[in-house]
Each structure stands twice: as C-alpha cells, then as structure tokens.
Amino acid sequence: MLREASIKRIKELFWEFQNIRSGISYEILDDGVKFSIDGKERTLTGFDALTNNEMKSLIYKEFLKEGISLPWGILTGIKPLKLYAKADDKEAFKEKFFVSDEKFELMERTFKNQHLNFEPKYSLYIHIPFCKGICSYCSFYTNDITKKAYDFTKYIDTVIDEMKIESKIRDISEPDSIYIGGGTPSAIDKANTQRLLKYINENYKFKELTFECGRADTMEKELLDILDKYGVSRICINPQTMNEETLKRVHRNAGLDELYKVYELARGYDFDINMDLIIGLEGEKRDDYINSVKKLISMRPESITIHNLALKRRAVLAQNDFKLENIDLSKEIYAGLYEAGYEPYYMYRQKMTNSNLENVAFSLRGRASIYNVISMNDLTSIYAFGAGAVSKYIDKDNLERKFNYKDIDLYIKNVYNKDI
C-alpha cells in the first residue's frame, strides 16, 4: 500500500501534466499507478519499494516518450531553490529532476543574487489584514473595510501588545528586517499607522523596514510623510496590470493615472519601490502582459515581481469557475528584465498556477529585499504578529510554524494567553 505522502506527490505530478495537456487520466493503485495519455494506457507498479523521486521519475519518463515535458520536471515543491542550493553537483541535480534549460538558468541566476553580506539573525513580520475592497483573483485572508467597520485602534493596540509579550520571551530588539504586509497595510487610518511605526522605530533597530502599500488608491502624501519619518526603507506599489480595463474587471479601483501620480510622489522620498504584476488575469492576452512589463521597466522601480496567477478556492474567480489559460511568456518577459538590468533574487512556486510556472522577484543590483531573501530560503526564524500571521521557528534544519487566529476577534481575545 502506498504511503499517503507518495500518493500526494503522484497527484501533484499528474495535476501539472493535466494543467498543460488534455487527454490525460490516471488511477492510483495499491503499489503503483495506471494512466492514459491520449488513449494509450500504461501501468507502473512496484512503487512501494521506491522513493517519491524514483516514482515520479518513472512516470515522467513515460511522458517523455510521448514528447510531453514540464518546465520544472519532477520538482513539484514550493521552493525548488532550496534543493538546488543543497546539491553539490548542479548538473546532476538538473538531470535527476528533469529541469529544463530555461528553469535551470533561472535557478542559477537567482541563487547568485540572493547572498547577504551579513550573517542573518531573525526578522519580524506584522500582518494588517484589511483591504479597501477584495480583488477577484485574491485568495489571501483579509477583511473588506468597505463592507464592515473595524476598530483599527484596538487591532493595532493588540499587535503592539503581542510584540511586547514576545519581547518578554526572547530578545527581538535588533531584527535584520521588519515586513509590514497584508491585506493592504495602507488601508487603515494614518493615526494608527503612525502609532505602529512610532513603536517600531522606538523599540527596534533594523536594517530594512518594508511597508506594503499595495493599492494606489490608499496612498497619499500624508502617508508617505509618515513612512519616511519613521524609517521605512522599502514600499510596495502593486498595479498587478497596466491595463485600465483589466483593473476594472478584477475590482481594482485605482486607475493608471492615480498609479502614475502616486508613483511620482513616492519617488520624491528615499524609498526603494517594488511593483507587482500578475500573469494570467481574466481577459488579458500576450500583448497586455508584455506591455505591462515594458511600462514598469520604463518606470524603473528598484524591484519588479512577476507572479503567475494561482487560482485558489477563496478567490472570487475560482468560485465563478474561471479557467486558467496556459500562457507561458516567462522566457520573453525575463529576457526583457535582464536586458534592463534587473536580476532575479528570489523565487517560489504555487499549486494551481498558470502553466505550472513560478513567481520571481527581480531587482536592480544591490536592491534585493533582505526580508524576501531570508523568508524564501528559510534562513532564520521569523516572529510574526497580527491576525492570520504565521511565525517560523528555525533551528538548524528544523522548521516549526505557529499560526495566529485569522478571525480578528479571536486573535484579540487569545493573544494575551501567550505563555510568558
């Protein structure tokens, strides 16, 4: 009888094939798998004596016989670069996992660009789970402030108290980086934003402080003044697309004029700026994606992050039976970014994504985010605060996650029960 973990890996591999090609079906047996490719049936057995990678390799070779391959080969995990980093023989790694030349080059370039010039200790993450409307593609846990009133003062009070409680458990006064994410952190009122940043500024010494503004319609000069005053070094302004019609379609209310205005305003400060794009949004075609990338490159933010749409159950699109298109423009998009002086510095994969592709952050030389490098490679512990925040405790090769309550009322009620 196959182990549960083995069954999971087999399902993941077949899902990736089915996502790019019709005419594929399969049935998991007690000690193997029976599957069909365009009506040609195959049965592989003896899996109970094999490792997960050996099983996947046997299956993959059958697809290769039919001229069917995957860009990432049999690498089905979220963080393929962690396996790459551990491999002594990189070429043998490429062959073992059937990784394409293009993705192998991406791993090589990313790995070279993510080294820190200091020994990391730990970082902090603060979650602000509020948004000014919910985008149709979004599957993150957040709360729509246009549908319900929330007590931001009480929430920020609780986050600050949680940080104080954690400080009694361990010294967290000198993190490498602090990341304030969401949700849309800039969706809360400025007075509470200032209170949180003032507390951070007075109690922590850090190398990098990121504030994920996100939507242009939540940003204005008063907010940027506050961020600048309290030591924010990096902000995110995320258009997701540079197509006006798509912005309306995905319920993202800020238009391009507002985006350009906010971006120019932010350029008047000493912030590094990241901008996100999503490949696979409803109604967009090749020219839309290429045009969006070109527009961002012309704006010259310090970093550009390319996401491939992941269709999760929580998203409105998924609930409306939206189907992902297989659009692989990664080679063309990455080439344009390379030519413009951007290099990849972190990457990860998700399930249920457009063309089984990856999410990659590119930055200009020397402008990579410390937090992203640490987080994506699980280099150190990350102590997380706020509703829905997930802490990662890392001790050598051991990683343990601790999840805060997602429900805001439950979070506020239970945060004071921490063992101090």
What are these regions (language model features)?
Residues 66-81, 86-125, 172:
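N-terminal [4Fe-4S]-dependent radical SAM core
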Residues 142-333:
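Conserved non-cysteine loop/helix-boundary elements of the Radical SAM core domain that shape
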Residues 314, 318, 322-385:
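A C-terminal junction/extension of Radical SAM enzymes
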Residues 1-77, 81, 86-88, 365-420:
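Radical SAM enzyme core and accessory elements
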Residues 121-156:
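Canonical Radical SAM [4Fe-4S] cluster-binding loop centered on the CxxxCxxC motif
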Residues 33-35, 126, 235-237:
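Short beta-strand motif preference
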Residues 84, 127-129, 276:
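Conserved acidic functional residues
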Residues 127, 236, 304-307, 372-373, ...:
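Beta-strand scaffold of nucleotide-dependent catalytic cores
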